[in-house]
Swiss-Prot record:
Annotated function: ATP-dependent specificity component of the Clp protease. It directs the protease to specific substrates. Can perform chaperone functions in the absence of ClpP.
HAMAP family the record matches: ClpX (MF_00175)
Protein name per the record: ATP-dependent Clp protease ATP-binding subunit ClpX
Known partners and oligomeric status: Component of the ClpX-ClpP complex. Forms a hexameric ring that, in the presence of ATP, binds to fourteen ClpP subunits assembled into a disk-like structure with a central cavity, resembling the structure of eukaryotic proteasomes.
Cell inner membrane is among the record's keywords: no
Repeat recorded as keyword: no
GO BP: any one term: cell division
Length: 418
């Protein structure tokens, strides 16, 4: 009898030939058997192949069209229609440019990095993260306030590339097609319009340091980061095809725009009504490169970010939509948490309006929604796991406004009602 033959007395794996005594589990199929070790090996092979496919970066032949990109953005980001269109077109053109850049004789197209302008909590970071998820490319985020030019205490701009490299599991080829989002970019505007005679290591100096990597250069990146290990081997990363998205709230830029379009802010001629009617987001829609120059950016830096997308402030209706409509909305997240305890969680319409109004009072945009919910629901989330007879929890506006306890429906009450 051959080794692979199986009998009722001695069953063996049809793939590796091990007997049922030699393995933990033997699974039977139509005339074949497979052991747990072969199943594990198959899983490893499949996982490795999937990882190899991801390593190739975005499949440019299957690159989603601008409309398809926006449709997915709509699932996660409420409102901001103009900004989503600008981003969808810019990202599509960016990766099409990469596809054609490898063909000899083609017109050389320059990279169009993106500048997002909008109030805190309006969705800038979420838009950038969602784009990277749609395209399945490595994504890294940096805070411009931590950056300094080389030679000063702080974070080197090269560390941004290192973060992207880490997100790509140190696969240089994949990292070179990634997306980097630099937040708080408004904080590196120089302190005055005229060039500084003294060093401005967190302003103009950082702009100069960012210029090369944003436009495209071959950066030498230490795998472990920092300048403390000069003996380690550097990795070469070409930033030419990395898409840079920079975002900021740009406090004070509205005044620059107002001056340009003739809206007086002081004196007897002040147009108070017009100024009050125009919100920050609406004013930012009128921004020009000259406004950014006056705000404190050097001309070369403005030139590296040719695509401008403005996000407007979120109103009460938008906040309520953000709470319940996106795929990963806060309401859906909390309902899932309670569902794991076999409890139904319900929010009244009034409670959602109350949460939105509280967030607007804090002036933190959509970012404030989670903290309001966490504070309002802390006690009930503490109690419910210890009460297996709870069937439903109802959050009303009184819970949000007056810190009252939520309505709790118990199993006995459900039985009595039936």
């Amino acid at each position: 009898m051959s080794r692979r033959e199986t009998t009722q007395e001695n069953l063996t794996c049809s793939f590796c030939g091990k007997s049922q005594e030699e393995v933990k589990k033997l699974i039977a199929g139509p005339a074949v058997y497979i052991c747990d070790e072969c199943i594990e090996l198959c899983n490893d092979i499949i996982a490795e192949e999937l990882k190899m496919e991801e390593t190739l970066g975005p499949d440019l032949k299957k690159l989603p069209k601008p409309r398809e990109i926006k449709d997915v953005l709509d699932e996660y980001v409420i409102g901001q229609e103009k900004a989503k269109k600008v981003l969808s077109v810019a990202v599509y053109n960016h990766y099409k440019r990469i596809e054609t850049s490898n063909k000899p004789g083609d017109v050389e197209m320059q990279k169009s990095n993106i500048l997002l302008l909008g109030p805190t909590g309006s969705g800038k970071t979420l838009l950038a993260q969602t784009l990277a998820r749609i395209l399945k490319v490595p994504f890294a985020m940096a805070d411009a306030t931590n950056l300094t030019e080389a030679g000063y205490v702080g974070e080197d701009v090269e560390n941004i590339i290192l973060s992207l490299l880490q997100a790509a599991d140190y696969d240089v080829e994949r990292a070179q097609k990634g997306i980097i989002y630099i937040d708080e970019i408004d904080k590196i505007a120089r302190k005055s319009e005229s060039p500084s005679l003294t060093r401005d290591v967190s302003g103009e100096g950082v702009q100069q340091a960012l210029l090369k990597i944003i436009e495209g250069t071959v950066a030498s990146i230490p795998p472990k980061g920092g300048r403390k290990h000069p003996q380690q081997e550097f990795m070469k990363v070409d930033t030419t095809n990395i898409l840079f998205i920079c975002g900021g709230a740009f406090a004070g830029l509205d005044s620059v725009i107002q001056q340009r379009i003739g809206m007086k802010s002081l004196g007897f001629g002040a147009d108070v009504k017009k100024r009050a009617e125009k919100k920050l987001g609406e004013l930012l829609l009128n921004v020009t490169p000259d406004d950014l120059l006056k705000y404190g950016y050097i001309p070369e830096f403005i030139g590296r970010l040719p695509m401008l997308a403005t996000l407007t402030e979120l109103d009460e209706d938008a906040m309520v939509q953000i709470l319940k409509e996106p795929k990963n909305s806060l309401v859906k997240q909390y309902q899932k948490l309670f569902e794991l305890e076999n409890v139904r969680l319900r929010f009244t319409d009034g409670s959602l309006v109350a949460i939105a109004r509280e967030a607007l009072k804090r002036n933190t945009g959509a970012r404030g929604l989670r903290s309001i919910l966490e504070n309002s629901m802390l006690d009930i989330m503490y109690e419910v796991p210890s009460q297996p007879n709870v069937k439903e929890v109802v959050i009303s506006e009184e819970v949000i406004y007056h810190k009252e306890k939520p309505i709790v429906v118990y199993e006995q009450q459900v039985s009595d009602a039936a």
